Amino acid sequence: SAVAAADPEAASQVATAMAQAAPEAAAAVAAGVASGVAQAAIAEVNQETAQANAEIQADAQGQIGDAQADFAEATGAGSETALADAQGEIADVQSATQDALIESNQAGQEAALAASQEATAEIISEMIAMNPDAAAEIIAGTAASNPEAAAEIVQEMMESNPEGAVEMCADIAEANPAAAALATEAIIESNPELAIEATAAMAEVAPAAAGAAAEVMAELAPEQAGEAAMAMQEAAPEAAAAIAGGVAQGNPEVAAEVANEMAAADPEAAADIATGVAVAAQANAQAEVAEAQAEAQAQVAEVQAGLADAVSEAQADLNSDDPNIVADAQATLADAQAQIADAQAAGQEAIAEVQGAAAETAQDLAGDIAGAMMEANPEAVADIAEQVAESAPGTAAGVMNAVAEVAPEQAVEAAATMADANPAAAGAAVEAVTEALPELATEAAVAMAEAAPEAAASIAASVAQANPDAATEIAAEMANVAA
């Protein structure tokens, strides 16, 4: 890494020699080279950006100097209008300078990213050419620090040598399971007819890579997702949860079909499949909320940027000796604050709406798949309840609704199992049972309170919210058990 950062031209020769001397270290060496080359490329672009920023600031200082001269002249003459004009001109220059610096920095970041990818791809390609036997390890190492460059190299190699594409995928995944996603994407782009075979090969040598591969298959090749998932499941049965979850995260629309196919092939995997989908559903909901939060922040920032010039000018006008100008400035600032507050309120409202919709979607997806898995393997109900409570408590209500619909005779046991596995999921679980099976509400609440006494208050509150008429009776039964 140090050599690559200091002298990128010599880095490939040094790194290749190191990798040839210690093949087991090829991935680590490649990661270091990729990191170092990227640092060097970014440093060069950053230097250019800094120079451009200095020129922007120098130009702004010149304009501000001219305005300050006008300011001094206006002060001496006592001209209120000229003074206000000078202050406004300075505010405009400062605002324009800030915008120019933001634009320059953004362009610099984009240029730095492009330069780092180009430089990394070039030097890593040279390493592979000089040490082809370590190609997979070199790519896997590169992916750890610069996945975009690694993906570019992999796709080029697969297009030039399709016969070795499957083996390359397996070798990359074995060296770095986290690189399975880029390998899957590359083979879909270059040799889609080999994608199923490649994903199975990756899962066989690196079960930890199966989830990422399944996610990419579902997203980019949904028509092959089911067959690929079953091939991976056969190669790595222990990865069933990750595979089902990957499919659900990559493309929720095909999750049910794929999960059913997987369960039909191996009913014993039903609990793992249901859990994997529940975890993915919860993650999808969290991602949607995060996206809504980022969008809301961007909208507020856009409003603030649109008001920046007016705010800057108004702040300058506050120094005026003319009370009318000061009053107008104060009104402008108050209006700006109101507009920003409105944007913030609208953002919070949008976030809340997305949170509700995302949570409902997650509950529905997790519940639908859990129900299908219970039908495929009725003996898996308790295991599904336990694993979901532990791994995806945010979907507990949806899964308990599935229990109530598919296996109501196991609802009390499943609810108690959930509470025992994760008391934090108890409230949502008992609320679902109370709404779906009110005749079992008391029995379920008591069983859950026995399994998780620390969650008794949450259980009682959830019951009261779901069925106020029965709350007193259920609370009394819970109190008797506690006593």
What kind of region is each of these model predictions?
Residues 1-483:
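General marker for long, soluble alpha-helical cores
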